Amino acid sequence: HTKPASIAQHANTSKSVWRYLLAWQITLLLGLNSFLNYIIITWLPSILTETGHSATQAGAYHGAFQIATALPGLILIPLLAKLKDQSALSFILAMLSALSALGLLYMPSFAFVWTLMLGFCSGACFILGLSFISLRTDDSQQAASLSGMSQSVGYLLAAIGPMLAGALHTTTGSWSAPLWLCAIAGVLCALCGLGSGKNTTLAKSANELL
Protein backbone atom coordinates (compact mmCIF):
# COMPACT_ATOMS: atom_id res chain seq x y z
CA HIS A 1 0.00 0.00 0.00
CA THR A 2 2.94 2.37 0.47
CA LYS A 3 4.19 2.03 -3.10
CA PRO A 4 1.19 3.72 -4.81
CA ALA A 5 1.37 6.49 -2.21
CA SER A 6 5.04 7.10 -2.93
CA ILE A 7 4.33 7.08 -6.67
CA ALA A 8 1.56 9.64 -6.16
CA GLN A 9 3.82 11.81 -4.04
CA HIS A 10 6.55 11.66 -6.69
CA ALA A 11 4.01 12.68 -9.31
CA ASN A 12 3.03 15.68 -7.21
CA THR A 13 6.61 16.80 -6.55
CA SER A 14 7.57 16.40 -10.23
CA LYS A 15 4.94 18.92 -11.36
CA SER A 16 6.26 22.36 -12.30
CA VAL A 17 6.19 24.66 -9.28
CA TRP A 18 4.78 27.39 -11.55
CA ARG A 19 1.46 25.49 -11.53
CA TYR A 20 0.94 25.58 -7.76
CA LEU A 21 -1.20 28.29 -6.17
CA LEU A 22 0.91 27.95 -3.00
CA ALA A 23 4.10 28.56 -5.01
CA TRP A 24 2.60 31.74 -6.46
CA GLN A 25 1.54 32.90 -2.99
CA ILE A 26 5.10 32.48 -1.71
CA THR A 27 6.55 34.09 -4.84
CA LEU A 28 4.25 37.10 -4.65
CA LEU A 29 4.80 37.45 -0.90
CA LEU A 30 8.50 37.90 -1.63
CA GLY A 31 7.97 39.84 -4.86
CA LEU A 32 5.45 42.36 -3.57
CA ASN A 33 7.51 42.87 -0.43
CA SER A 34 10.57 43.59 -2.60
CA PHE A 35 8.46 45.92 -4.77
CA LEU A 36 7.47 47.95 -1.69
CA ASN A 37 10.91 47.74 -0.07
CA TYR A 38 12.83 49.01 -3.09
CA ILE A 39 10.43 51.90 -3.62
CA ILE A 40 11.08 53.02 -0.04
CA ILE A 41 14.85 52.46 -0.24
CA THR A 42 15.02 54.52 -3.44
CA TRP A 43 12.63 57.35 -2.69
CA LEU A 44 12.38 57.70 1.11
CA PRO A 45 14.70 60.74 1.35
CA SER A 46 12.68 62.56 -1.33
CA ILE A 47 9.39 61.59 0.33
CA LEU A 48 10.61 62.90 3.68
CA THR A 49 12.00 66.20 2.38
CA GLU A 50 8.76 66.90 0.51
CA THR A 51 6.76 66.33 3.72
CA GLY A 52 8.74 68.92 5.67
CA HIS A 53 11.77 67.05 7.01
CA SER A 54 15.30 68.37 6.66
CA ALA A 55 17.88 66.65 4.47
CA THR A 56 19.75 65.60 7.63
CA GLN A 57 16.62 64.01 9.11
CA ALA A 58 15.83 62.30 5.81
CA GLY A 59 19.32 60.81 5.67
CA ALA A 60 19.15 59.62 9.28
CA TYR A 61 15.70 58.07 8.80
CA HIS A 62 16.88 56.36 5.62
CA GLY A 63 19.75 54.79 7.54
CA ALA A 64 17.39 53.76 10.34
CA PHE A 65 15.12 52.08 7.78
CA GLN A 66 17.96 49.92 6.49
CA ILE A 67 19.08 49.00 10.01
CA ALA A 68 15.50 48.07 10.93
CA THR A 69 15.31 45.60 8.02
CA ALA A 70 18.08 43.56 9.67
CA LEU A 71 16.47 43.36 13.12
CA PRO A 72 13.83 40.66 12.36
CA GLY A 73 16.58 38.10 11.87
CA LEU A 74 17.33 38.27 15.59
CA ILE A 75 13.69 37.75 16.59
CA LEU A 76 11.91 35.80 13.87
CA ILE A 77 14.25 32.87 13.32
CA PRO A 78 13.86 31.51 16.90
CA LEU A 79 10.11 32.25 16.72
CA LEU A 80 9.64 30.36 13.45
CA ALA A 81 10.86 27.17 15.08
CA LYS A 82 7.94 27.35 17.53
CA LEU A 83 5.20 28.27 15.05
CA LYS A 84 3.65 25.58 12.86
CA ASP A 85 1.38 28.05 11.07
CA GLN A 86 2.72 31.49 10.13
CA SER A 87 -0.40 32.84 8.36
CA ALA A 88 -1.41 35.35 11.03
CA LEU A 89 2.16 36.55 11.53
CA SER A 90 2.67 37.08 7.79
CA PHE A 91 -0.66 38.88 7.43
CA ILE A 92 -0.06 41.23 10.37
CA LEU A 93 3.48 42.16 9.32
CA ALA A 94 2.50 42.92 5.73
CA MET A 95 -0.55 44.93 6.83
CA LEU A 96 1.69 46.98 9.14
CA SER A 97 3.86 47.74 6.11
CA ALA A 98 0.79 49.02 4.27
CA LEU A 99 -0.25 51.08 7.30
CA SER A 100 3.23 52.58 7.60
CA ALA A 101 3.25 53.67 3.96
CA LEU A 102 -0.01 55.55 4.51
CA GLY A 103 1.37 56.88 7.79
CA LEU A 104 4.21 58.56 5.89
CA LEU A 105 1.59 60.24 3.72
CA TYR A 106 -1.06 61.27 6.26
CA MET A 107 0.91 61.55 9.52
CA PRO A 108 4.40 62.67 8.43
CA SER A 109 5.22 64.06 11.89
CA PHE A 110 5.59 60.42 13.01
CA ALA A 111 7.83 59.58 10.05
CA PHE A 112 10.55 58.05 12.22
CA VAL A 113 8.04 55.54 13.65
CA TRP A 114 6.66 54.69 10.20
CA THR A 115 10.17 54.33 8.81
CA LEU A 116 11.25 51.91 11.54
CA MET A 117 8.02 49.93 11.20
CA LEU A 118 8.39 49.71 7.43
CA GLY A 119 11.97 48.53 7.73
CA PHE A 120 11.21 45.94 10.39
CA CYS A 121 8.11 44.56 8.67
CA SER A 122 9.64 44.38 5.19
CA GLY A 123 12.69 42.62 6.63
CA ALA A 124 10.44 40.20 8.50
CA CYS A 125 8.35 39.41 5.41
CA PHE A 126 11.55 38.72 3.48
CA ILE A 127 12.73 36.24 6.12
CA LEU A 128 9.31 34.57 6.21
CA GLY A 129 9.22 34.25 2.43
CA LEU A 130 12.67 32.66 2.32
CA SER A 131 11.68 30.29 5.13
CA PHE A 132 8.56 29.21 3.24
CA ILE A 133 10.70 28.06 0.30
CA SER A 134 12.04 25.23 2.47
CA LEU A 135 9.03 24.79 4.78
CA ARG A 136 6.49 24.39 1.95
CA THR A 137 8.45 22.15 -0.41
CA ASP A 138 8.83 18.37 -0.31
CA ASP A 139 12.39 17.85 -1.56
CA SER A 140 15.54 19.79 -2.45
CA GLN A 141 14.77 19.83 -6.18
CA GLN A 142 11.37 21.39 -5.57
CA ALA A 143 12.91 23.92 -3.17
CA ALA A 144 15.49 24.91 -5.80
CA SER A 145 12.75 25.34 -8.41
CA LEU A 146 10.63 27.47 -6.09
CA SER A 147 13.68 29.54 -5.15
CA GLY A 148 14.36 30.22 -8.84
CA MET A 149 10.72 31.11 -9.45
CA SER A 150 10.49 33.48 -6.49
CA GLN A 151 13.81 35.17 -7.26
CA SER A 152 13.02 35.77 -10.93
CA VAL A 153 9.60 37.30 -10.20
CA GLY A 154 10.93 39.09 -7.11
CA TYR A 155 13.81 40.78 -8.94
CA LEU A 156 11.44 41.83 -11.72
CA LEU A 157 9.01 43.46 -9.29
CA ALA A 158 11.88 45.01 -7.32
CA ALA A 159 13.20 46.60 -10.53
CA ILE A 160 9.79 47.86 -11.65
CA GLY A 161 8.81 49.39 -8.28
CA PRO A 162 11.15 52.40 -8.06
CA MET A 163 10.69 53.27 -11.75
CA LEU A 164 6.90 53.11 -11.48
CA ALA A 165 6.88 55.16 -8.28
CA GLY A 166 9.15 57.77 -9.86
CA ALA A 167 6.95 57.98 -12.95
CA LEU A 168 3.84 58.41 -10.78
CA HIS A 169 5.53 61.18 -8.81
CA THR A 170 6.57 62.96 -12.00
CA THR A 171 3.08 62.66 -13.45
CA THR A 172 1.11 63.67 -10.35
CA GLY A 173 3.60 66.02 -8.70
CA SER A 174 3.26 64.39 -5.28
CA TRP A 175 4.10 61.20 -3.40
CA SER A 176 0.46 60.34 -2.68
CA ALA A 177 0.04 57.90 -5.57
CA PRO A 178 3.38 56.11 -4.99
CA LEU A 179 2.66 55.69 -1.27
CA TRP A 180 -0.83 54.39 -2.01
CA LEU A 181 0.82 51.99 -4.46
CA CYS A 182 3.05 50.80 -1.59
CA ALA A 183 0.00 50.38 0.64
CA ILE A 184 -1.81 48.32 -2.01
CA ALA A 185 1.30 46.16 -2.47
CA GLY A 186 1.38 45.65 1.30
CA VAL A 187 -2.26 44.53 1.40
CA LEU A 188 -1.74 42.10 -1.50
CA CYS A 189 1.40 40.83 0.23
CA ALA A 190 -0.67 40.23 3.39
CA LEU A 191 -3.23 38.19 1.43
CA CYS A 192 -0.43 36.08 -0.06
CA GLY A 193 0.95 35.64 3.45
CA LEU A 194 -2.35 34.14 4.60
CA GLY A 195 -1.99 31.36 2.03
CA SER A 196 1.76 30.83 2.11
CA GLY A 197 1.86 30.79 5.92
CA LYS A 198 -0.38 27.73 6.21
CA ASN A 199 1.19 24.54 7.58
CA THR A 200 1.22 22.58 4.32
CA THR A 201 3.47 21.66 1.39
CA LEU A 202 3.18 21.84 -2.38
CA ALA A 203 2.43 18.11 -2.61
CA LYS A 204 -0.38 18.41 -0.05
CA SER A 205 -1.83 21.36 -1.95
CA ALA A 206 -1.77 19.56 -5.31
CA ASN A 207 -5.56 20.00 -5.60
CA GLU A 208 -4.91 23.77 -5.93
CA LEU A 209 -3.04 23.67 -9.23
CA LEU A 210 -3.40 26.56 -11.66
Kindly label every feature range from the protein language model.
Residues 47-52, 82-83, 132-140, 171:
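Helix-to-coil boundary motifs at intracellular loop junctions of multi-pass secondary transporters
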Residues 61-65, 115, 146-150, 178-181:
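Hydrophobic positions within alpha-helical transmembrane segments
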Residues 174, 180-210:
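Multi-pass alpha-helical transporter architecture, strongest
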Residues 137-175, 182:
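A late C-terminal transmembrane helix in Major Facilitator Superfamily
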